[in-house]
Curated annotation (Swiss-Prot):
The lineage of its organism: Bacteria, Pseudomonadati, Pseudomonadota, Gammaproteobacteria, Enterobacterales. It catalyses: (S)-allantoin + H2O = allantoate + H(+). Zn(2+) 2 binds at K146, H186, H242. This is Allantoinase. It comes from Escherichia coli (strain 55989 / EAEC). InterPro entries: Allantoinase, Allantoinase_bact, Amidohydro-rel, DHOase/Allantoinase_Hydrolase, Metal-dep_hydrolase_composite, Metal_Hydrolase.
Length: 453
């Protein structure tokens, strides 16, 4: 058989091993894995490179339509491709209107036409005002539903995202359980975090350490414990977003051991930044839950290596620079991190701490694809989409603002020396990013809908 593409001599991350092997691609799919596979129209030599499944980033905010001056499909997905992401799962908030019904998700699809460099799946929102319309989003094909039990949204904008109270969460989870959809939750105690934050501002405590103190670990743990129980009673699968503390992970592990259907994610910034660095970097490193101290970070690494965290995600949530101005308590909370998930974590987890390549592949791609039912994604295996990222190990560079593809070229990682490089990203058999050529093809990404899987 003649193939469209053969990738030769790379160290390939397979599901349970990594070895030097060739990959054949035909019609955008992985056709064969082995040696001496035959002829191809194109042959790529990946000698000295790690060939990983393209990252499946299960937590991104693109903000289009309505807030494309924050981030947009064109810039956001180019940054993703440059960072080795081939599939993103987009959150239902930051854009206007929030993605909470059929009409709003159709606006998303229209806004993305001709702009997607990578593939995308979409989450719907569970908010205080759409519990009777959740089925609309399920019918369109979302792969899950996001909600906040922490305070969110601009009360001055009618169609912005809104948090839910316990009753609304429970009723929504019941409906989502009936639909067979997971609920994804931002877990922080709204009343306590809001009160502590207001108290700090009144008293003039506005440093990074003050911000972290206003959102203590127990507020995350309490919220995780609460939604675990409510989701269990409601009969709904639960995914806990961006866990920042080992104590929070322990709640998920305990529930899982008791038989509950629950998964969780965390983000690179909780593993590579700490509160002292947050103080130095400033508002660009503000997020919630917040970046915590070194002892907390050490515990998170232990949980990651123990297999208690299912996947790593960017939680890419940028905004215009003026919203990051002023003191840390007042600035927008969100990190621009889409472009540097894979290289930073390959350096920190694999090269510096000895994580196995198969575990890295699961954390960056396989597990997220499985959690959200993306059956063609997340694995290098025959029949799957030919989505790959080439990683050059032990190749250090210093990240600059000019390296970034975001609408606003800022990131808390600027100035960081990163010890690995993404050299090529391939989506369904086509090179969508190359370190020398840039972006050689027109945007070819498409939306992945649940009912098409």
């Amino acid at each position: 058989m003649s193939f469209d593409l053969i990738i030769k001599n790379g160290t390939v991350i397979l599901e349970n091993e990594a070895r030097v092997v060739d990959i054949a691609v035909k019609g955008g799919k992985i056709a064969a894995i082995g040696q001496d596979l035959g002829d191809a129209k194109e042959v790529m030599d990946a000698s000295g490179l790690v060939v990983s499944p393209g990252m499946v980033d299960a937590h991104t905010h693109i903000s289009e339509p309505g807030r494309s001056h924050w981030e947009g499909y064109e810039t956001g997905t180019r940054a993703a491709a440059k960072g080795g992401i081939t599939t993103m799962i987009e959150m239902p908030l930051n854009q206007l209107p929030a993605t909470v019904d059929r009409a709003s998700i159709e606006l998303k699809f229209d806004a993305a036409k001709g702009k997607l460099t990578i593939d995308a799946a979409q989450l719907g929102g569970l908010v205080s005002y759409n519990i009777d319309r959740l089925h609309e989003l399920d019918e369109v094909g979302v792969v899950g539903f996001k909600c906040f039990v922490a305070t969110c949204g601009d009360r001055g904008i009618d169609n912005d995202f809104r948090d839910v109270n316990d009753w609304q969460f429970f009723k929504g989870a019941q409906k989502l359980g009936e639909l067979g959809q997971p609920v994804l939750v931002h877990c922080e105690n709204a009343l306590i975090c809001d009160a502590l934050g207001e108290e700090a501002k009144r008293e003039g405590r506005v440093t990074a350490h003050d911000y972290v103190a206003s959102r203590p670990v127990f507020t995350e743990v309490e919220a995780i414990r609460r939604v675990l129980y409510l989701a269990k009673v409601a009969g709904c699968r639960l995914h806990v977003c961006h866990i920042s503390s080992p104590e929070g992970v322990e709640e998920v592990t305990r529930a899982r051991q008791e038989g509950q259907d629950v998964t969780c994610e965390s983000c690179p910034h909780y593993f590579v930044l700490d509160t002292d660095q947050f103080e130095e970097i400033g508002t660009l490193a503000k997020c919630s839950p917040p970046i915590r101290d070194l002892e907390n970070q050490k515990g998170m690494w232990e949980k990651l290596f123990n297999g208690e965290i299912d996947c790593l995600v960017s939680d890419h949530s940028p905004c215009p620079p003026e919203m990051k101005a002023g003191n840390i308590m007042e600035a927008w909370g969100g990190i621009a991190g889409l472009q540097n998930c894979m290289d930073v974590m390959f350096d920190e987890a694999v090269q510096k701490r000895g994580m196995s390549l198969p575990m890295f592949g699961k954390l960056m791609a396989t597990n997220a694809a499985d959690i959200f039912g993306l059956q063609q994604k997340g694995r290098i295996a025959p029949g799957k989409d030919a989505d790959f990222v080439f990683i050059q190990p032990n190749s250090s560079y210093v990240l600059t603002n000019d390296d970034l593809e975001y609408r606003h070229k800022v990131s808390p990682y600027v100035g960081r020396t990163i010890g690995a490089r993404i050299t090529k990203t391939i989506l369904r058999g086509d090179v969508i990013y190359d370190i020398e050529q840039g972006f050689p093809v027109a945007p070819k990404g498409q939306f992945i809908l649940k009912h098409q899987q």
